[in-house]
Amino acid sequence: MIALLILSLTCSASTYRLQGFTNAGIVAYKNIQDDNIVFSPFGYSFSMFMSLLPASGNTRIELLKTMDLRKRDLGPAFTELISGLAKLKTSKYTYTDLTYQSFVDNTVCIKPSYYQQYHRFGLYRLNFRRDAVNKINSIVERRSGMSNVVDSNMLDNNTLWAIINTIYFKGIWQYPFDITKTRNASFTNKYGTKTVPMMNVVTKLQGNTITIDDKEYDMVRLPYKDANISMYLAIGDNMTHFTDSITAAKLDYWSFQLGNKVYNLKLPKFSIENKRDIKSIAEMMAPSMFNPDNASFKHMTRDPLYIYKMFQNAKIDVDEQGTVAEASTIMVATARSSPEKLEFNTPFVFIIRHDITGFILFMGKVESP
């Protein structure tokens, strides 16, 4: 059996304009082929959305299509996005922090209308040829607490514009695993069988068997304490088929199918960190913004900018107490009943989800914990 783990932020009917936003991040994830993966669909989609705001011409048309938006829906969708971010409240047990920064070179002429509308979200002017890496890292760390987000491989003397967003999540399980019951156990993947620390909890959770086409998957929801954020775990024989089936709407539908059951749940502790060049993935969705001849960001500047680099760094740690996950996404532009036993002892995928808004914060796959 192969397992799927989903940590996510759910789409409600009131945020229908943002289902395309969520789906863009899911599609990006599906184009990653590594074994152990941690990825932030929200971080990816947020960067694409914020590059849509200054875009024009074919660049705007492609980005609107990526977000499944009509031109007249862009303003309302932006309002809904900001409203959704406000719902990610920090509590005594859960900390969620999102930041956005747009760094523009001093030589680029920003239109006053764009500056007036968006500068409050984090618009900075600087000289990219004078210690830009340290200056940007200092600003991002001051705002997010995350250090060394960019390096000299991401920025160079050609850089004129950099979009950076960060996400940090720390959540305590509503029903923590008992650390005294963690035992070494077998975990089997395509490479063979290994011994891993397996956590254990017996408690009432929401779960069910869901059917996709003719295939069945056992799914269970692990809530975080006082957060409206949950981790969804699923296990079945064909997780590639499960992953291919994921959309924002289907995640909503599956979550509504879950009912209360008592589980004896076993889940391995795991930690994953990825640093990934995601330009080729974004280029499949909106190719013109990466083309020096076709890119247009004329709602921000008349300077002929185009995106030439895009990265995402992400990591996640899951243990008996809860989850810590963080990600930074960087776009760089230049000119031009009785306890039911459920053991995750084979590879699984994860998604992090806020059960109100529908934004998927983190998603990934564990082949070898």
UniProtKB/Swiss-Prot annotation:
MF (Gene Ontology): serine-type endopeptidase inhibitor activity
SMART domains: SERPIN
Protein name in UniProt: Superinfection exclusion protein
Signal peptide: 1-15
Cellular compartments per GO CC: extracellular space; host cell plasma membrane; membrane; virion membrane
Subunit-structure text: Interacts with A56 protein.
Topology of the protein relative to the lipid bilayer: Peripheral membrane protein
Coiled coil residues, start to end: none
Induction of synthesis: Expressed in the intermediate phase of the viral replicative cycle.
UniProt source species: Vaccinia virus (strain Ankara) (VACV)
Family membership: Belongs to the serpin family. Orthopoxvirus OPG040 subfamily.
Claim: Secreted is one of the keywords in the record: no
Cell compartment(s), UniProt: Virion membrane; Host cell membrane
InterPro entries in alphabetical order: Serpin_dom, Serpin_fam, Serpin_sf, Serpin_sf_1, Serpin_sf_2
Major location category of this protein: virion
Keywords, in A-Z order: Host cell membrane, Host membrane, Membrane, Protease inhibitor, Serine protease inhibitor, Signal, Virion
Function according to Swiss-Prot or TrEMBL: Prevents cell to cell fusion via its interaction with A56 protein. The A56-K2 complex associates with components of the entry fusion complex (EFC) presumably to avoid superinfection and syncytium formation.
